[in-house]
Amino acid sequence: MNGEEQYYAATQLYKDPCAFQRGPAPEFSASPPACLYMGRQPPPPPPPHPFPGALGALEQGSPPDISPYEVPPLADDPAVAHLHHHLPAQLALPHPPAGPFPEGAEPGVLEEPNRVQLPFPWMKSTKAHAWKGQWAGGAYAAEPEENKRTRTAYTRAQLLELEKEFLFNKYISRPRRVELAVMLNLTERHIKIWFQNRRMKWKKEEDKKRGGGTAVGGGGVAEPEQDCAVTSGEELLALPPPPPPGGAVPPAAPVAAREGRLPPGLSASPQPSSVAPRRPQEPR
């Protein structure tokens, strides 16, 4: 029976959440700690404090002979306010004042909430993209771009000097490039790019000339062959035939036969060397 009485007594002791805080209040009783052993469930409303005199002693502060340090007034303590006003601890905690800007935020970011933030420089607008101003995302301010390349307009005097230099040297050296840049009031990069473009143009012109010359040369070679193949009969008669290997008929035989100076036994046509010419038969 004694064990059961002790068990029920202990159970009644732990039923009250703040039972361990009760006791005789000393003269310098400090603020009682808040109930921290409760779980995540919301705490029930605490019962009224059985010692109202203790609150008066707490509000007066600790005596100077016990604590040499200054003790802040207990009215600002959340635990004392929790016990004094019988409210939950969550409502008794002071809320931080809501400033105009959150911590770590810049004022310029909140001034323009509709402004589009572009973290990359290549996403910024350029002068060439004028269509961006027509869509809703083009409302952001375009910063001036100093590194944007613009097309260089060369004057006639500059082009004349560059063409002269290119006529003598297709590939310009570094010292000469520096000299031309100073003389023409240009940068080395401008001169280098101009020479690169001029070389490409010159190579295209050379390739075009080579292709046209090959076509013309092929036609010129083929035309004489066609003229020699297509000839008339009169031209063939006018040309002397090649001499035979045996040499029986002189080269002037065709001309003499045409003029009628050959004897009747000889023929104007060439004969092979294996066949001897016929002699005229003598009358019997």
Swiss-Prot record:
The keyword Glycosyltransferase does not apply. Phosphorylated by the SAPK2 pathway at high intracellular glucose concentration. Phosphorylated by HIPK2 on Ser-269 upon glucose accumulation. This phosphorylation mediates subnuclear localization shifting. Phosphorylation by PASK may lead to translocation into the cytosol. This is Pancreas/duodenum homeobox protein 1. Residues 41-51, 239-253 have a biased composition (Pro residues). Residues 34-75, 202-284 are annotated as: Disordered. The gene is PDX1. Disulfide bonds: none annotated. Residues 13-74 are annotated as: Transactivation domain. Residues 212-221 have a biased composition (Gly residues). A motif (Nuclear localization signal) lies at residues 198-204. Belongs to the Antp homeobox family. IPF1/XlHbox-8 subfamily. It comes from Gorilla gorilla gorilla (Western lowland gorilla). One of its GO terms (molecular function) is chromatin binding. A motif (Antp-type hexapeptide) lies at residues 119-124. Activates insulin and somatostatin gene transcription. Key regulator of islet peptide hormone expression but also responsible for the development of the pancreas, most probably by determining maturation and differentiation of common pancreatic precursor cells in the developing gut. Binds the DNA sequence 5'-CC[CT]TAATGGG-3'. The Antp-type hexapeptide mediates heterodimerization with PBX on a regulatory element of the somatostatin promoter. The modification Phosphothreonine is found at T152. One of its GO terms (cellular component) is cytosol. One of its GO terms (biological process) is intrinsic apoptotic signaling pathway in response to endoplasmic reticulum stress.
